[in-house]
Amino acid sequence: MSTYAPFAKPLYVMLKPVGAVCNLACDYCYYLEKAKLYRENPKHVMSEELLEKFIEEYINSQTMPQVLFTWHGGETLMRPLAFYKRAMELQKKYANGRTIDNCIQTNGTLLTDEWCRFFKENNWLVGVSIDGPQEFHDEYRKNKQGKPSFVKVMQGINLLKKHGVEWNGMAVVNDYNADYPLDFYNFFKELGCHYIQFAPIVERIAPHRDGRHLASLQDKENSTELADFSVSPEQWGNFLCTLFDEWVKQDVGTYYIQLFDSTLANWIGEQPGVCSMAKTCGHAGVMEFNGDVYACDHFVFPEYKLGNIYQKTLVEMMYSEKQQNFGLMKQRSLPTQCKECEWLFACNGECPKNRFAHTSNGEPGLNYLCAGYRKFFKHAAPYMDFMKNELMNQRPPANVMEAVGRLKIDNL
């Protein structure tokens, strides 16, 4: 008998089939050090027994006819193809009439013709991590021997394109590349990548007894320091404004930039489709290779562990009071400055992970990137207003491209 979640929304838990294991050693990776949480495990590999248990329970816990599996790392392709073929067999075994979709995130360096044929034949969506042109990408994305990875990533992308695999780009915006948004954007356009996520990297350093060095919200501010690779609020704001100017003039409806789509969704009062911009979070859990479930991919810390699938069901963990409180914390912990901000509806304070700054009155809990977001929202507001009006009147938001000249706002 199926166990149904008490809320009419999909239960969503990302899978980590190899935990934090990866063939790269990117300087800014927030997940690589999670392996130190599992030092007692000699092999960070998800067993077939656990794979089947998760798939059966995950599918049966859904209240929707469509089920999304997201495979994340570490580097997902360090599991052999046979593992994912077995996963699909199990998905079909337990589907019970539901439609199953799969997406997988990879650094692209291990892609082969065989992998790409599998993804194409089974309609998998592939997300590729690539930080723009070679100079930007190779600054921080190196292998364990310190050698750059760009050439291998491009070989992988070319294989995806050769086989007609649907793929998206995921780029980290850091201190080094943030000053070149158009170089970044044009690179993806030249690759023929129409769906792009630009993710700002912000991390704090706080040594822990177990060897981890990245801070969680529980680490006191006076014991942390900002990581050198972090993008600054000013850089982030300038990056978004310059990128938006280019996009809104000629690419609306052709190229999809996640943050712009999410902003427009919030502008019209719809769900933004990404937890960082939503009013509450906690809808996207993550399961490690051994069955441990955590509140969020960015909160894989001991204090945010919900339990283990061998002791508790996914429904019990994801709809637990602890997880409910985690999700509501996003809204409840907003400082007064945010609650009174004219742009609160657009960002909802962004990700709690980045809320370690102080307001002008000294109140804690302000998002470190706040100034950058405020600059962007003010800059984009007239165009968001226009696109909102088009959507409300059942017209395509892409009409904004024809109106840019007439609006004569800012410096477009």
Task: Give residue spans per PLM region.
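Short loop/turn microsegments at loop-to-beta-strand junctions
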Residues: 13, 281-283
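Conserved AdoMet/S-adenosylmethionine-binding subsite of the radical SAM
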Residues: 56, 78-197, 204-206, 210
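Radical SAM enzyme [4Fe-4S]-AdoMet core and its adjacent flexible, acidic
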Residues: 143-151, 158, 162-276, 280, ...
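Short Gly/Pro-enriched turn/cap motifs at secondary-structure boundaries
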Residues: 273-277, 284, 328-332
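Flexible mid-to-C-terminal extensions adjoining Fe-S/redox cofactors in radical SAM and related proteins
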Residues: 300-412
